[in-house]
From Swiss-Prot:
PANTHER family membership: DNA-BINDING PROTEIN HU, INTEGRATION HOST FACTOR SUBUNIT BETA
Gene3D superfamilies: IHF-like DNA-binding proteins (4.10.520.10)
Assembly and oligomerization: Heterodimer of an alpha and a beta chain.
One MF term in the entry's GO annotations: DNA binding
InterPro entries assigned: Hist_DNA-bd (IPR000119), Histone-like_DNA-bd_CS (IPR020816), IHF-like_DNA-bd_dom_sf (IPR010992), IHF_beta (IPR005685)
Function: This protein is one of the two subunits of integration host factor, a specific DNA-binding protein that functions in genetic recombination as well as in transcriptional and translational control.
Taxonomic path: Bacteria, Pseudomonadati, Pseudomonadota, Alphaproteobacteria, Rhodobacterales
Entries under Pfam families matching the protein: Bac_DNA_binding (PF00216)
A GO CC term attached to the entry: cytosol
Name of the protein described by the UniProt record: Integration host factor subunit beta
Name of the gene this protein is made from: ihfB
Amino acid sequence: MIRSELIQKIADENPHLYQRDVERIVNTVFEEVTNAMSRGDRVELRGFGAFSVKKRDARVGRNPRTGETVHVEEKHVPFFKTGKLLRDRLNGKEE
C-alpha cells in the first residue's frame, strides 16, 4: 500500500471527511514521526510498534565487485520493532 492508497482508504471509510483533509492529516502524521526520529526520539504506537533510530558504527567494508576494502562512515538508521498486537495478527492469532 502506498500513501495515496492509504489516504483513499481512510477517506472511503470516513465519508464525513474530505479527502484533502485526510491527506493533510496523513502527511502531518508522517512529518511528525520523521521530525521526532530526526531528533533521536522514539515514536511508539501501542499495539502497532515503535520507531527508533539506531547508530551503526564506522567499519571497514569490502567492495563486492573489486574486493577493495573501503571505510564505511558511522551512520544512523531507522529501526522498527513490531508491537504484540501486530505480531499476533500477522501470525493469525487475531482476538
